[in-house]
Amino acid sequence: SIGVDGRLDVNYEILTDVAIPQIPIVGMTIKTVPELKELHWLGLGPYDAYPNKKAASILGVWGGEAGSADVTGMKATRWIERSNSECGFRIMSNGYMKHDASHPEIMHILSYVFGRPEKGRQADESVPQMRTDTGVPFVGGFSILLNADLQKK
């Protein structure tokens, strides 16, 4: 839904119909214009963060140029900003962001992330397993604020 202040709230449910027992990620993909070169986030960084691997990451505001080694990978987030000197937007999302150097204009806003295997072992049962055979949909959401709204916050 779009509020009178221009805030876009996105909510989704995904009910899987696949032949695999688990899925690696659940979320949505956002493609931006190439001119929005800066990417910043409040969350864990600068290293990758997964539900079962957060020890090397530190809570803070992180960022750099989209597609650079400073911002690529899997990041646990509270908000994400794409901008340049003239305009931008903020995504409010209590989840994860995946960003790849090969497609700097694309961000994956994720509500669920499968625990990362370590040394050949799968994540233990304390990490959400994201099973596809339960009949329960994956639910997520986020909000987008335009640059003008950021200056008021």
Predicted regions and their residues:
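Beta-strand/loop-rich accessory regions of lumenal/periplasmic or secreted enzymes
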Residues: 1-153
